[in-house]
């Protein structure tokens, strides 16, 4: 996904395939949030905001790391859900049941981590808001909104848990 053109990603997202899906999209929302916060921090770094330089530098360093992590989580989510689909295609029996359980447990990890990243991004938006360059302040709000989309990630995460395991896998 990292190097995939946006139009191609959206075509794949719209296709009748298991991945990418909601979890990958939520992680990309977090990546967009981090990118916007990074932009705001960079526009806020300078002589006019010198008294907040340490705070701005700290936020900038963290959001850059979180942006990279969120993109990785989007990729991890797509891989994990492909594993779920592959497990469901196995012939019925104990090996299939075990494969489904393992795949579902693995598929819950990226959304859970995405939630943590998004929550941290909301906190960083709150830190940046009072010290940010006023010309880009609305971008802080857009970043916070993108990160708050983690609620859909909670649904993806809970839907990935072994409760989806069929009784006669």
Where do the model's predicted regions map?
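Ribosome-associated translation termination/rescue signal centered on the conserved GGQ peptidyl-tRNA hydrolysis loop
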Residues: 37-38, 42
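A structural-propensity feature for long, helix-poor, extended segments
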Residues: 47-90
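Short, charged, low-complexity loops and linkers
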Residues: 13-24, 57-65, 97-108, 134
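Amphipathic alpha-helical interface segments
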Residues: 77-146, 150-151
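Conserved small/polar residues in nucleotide/adenosyl-binding loops
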Residues: 153-158, 169
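Conserved phosphate/anionic-ligand binding catalytic regions in large, soluble enzymes, centered on
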Residues: 15-36, 136-152
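Short, hydrophobic/aliphatic alpha-helical segments
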Residues: 1-19
């Amino acid at each position: 996904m990292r190097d995939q053109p946006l139009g191609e990603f959206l075509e794949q997202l719209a296709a009748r395939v298991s991945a990418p899906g909601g979890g990958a999209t939520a992680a990309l929302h977090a990546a967009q949030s981090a990118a916007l916060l990074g932009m705001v921090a960079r526009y806020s770094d300078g002589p006019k905001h010198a008294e907040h330089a340490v705070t701005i530098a700290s936020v900038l360093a963290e959001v850059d790391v979180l942006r990279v992590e969120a993109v990785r989580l989007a990729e991890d989510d797509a891989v994990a859900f492909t594993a779920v689909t592959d497990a469901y295609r196995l012939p019925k029996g104990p090996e299939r049941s075990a494969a489904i359980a393992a795949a579902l447990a693995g598929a819950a990890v990226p959304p859970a981590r995405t939630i943590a990243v998004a929550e941290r991004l909301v906190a960083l938006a709150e830190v940046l808001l009072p010290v940010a360059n006023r010309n880009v302040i609305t971008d802080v709000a857009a970043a916070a909104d993108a990160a708050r989309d983690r609620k859909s990630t909670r649904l993806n995460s809970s839907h990935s848990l072994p409760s989806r395991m069929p009784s006669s896998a």
